[in-house]
Amino acid sequence: MVWTYWNLGPDLCEAQAPGKAQRSAFFRRLMQDLAYPAGTSTFWPACLPDSDAMPASPAPAEGEDRSRYQPNADVFWSGVQALHARAVVVMGSVAARALGLPAGVRPLQQLRHRGTLVWVLWDVEFLLDEPQRYAAMLAFVRRALQQISRR
């Protein structure tokens, strides 16, 4: 299973990405709560650095425009195929648009895109700000994972 969210690109590329520590803690908790075996999940970014826009220093300035990260749906979906992922979890509408998912997809929705089962969740930052949604999201993911683990 592949997980992605818009800020995964900055989280992988920038040691001091704003909010990185909170997102990392969120995913550690989520993976622990799901209790799936190691190697079941991987993370693949929905956006990549625009090499022409990357500064010499990897640390972003306060309030820096993050537009130096660009979506590349073709790279993402070819990575999903190369990883032989049985499903993709897309967190947030920005990531969903970046990956070319149909307009109007909503959190806690399942669809097929490019032949792959996709589950759309709320954005990580939204879940951090609205912790009462965590239980609903966790229940949805557990049910969804049962679909692919039976195959």
Q: Which residues does each predicted region cover?
A:
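A polyanion-binding, active-site-adjacent surface
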Residues: M1-R151
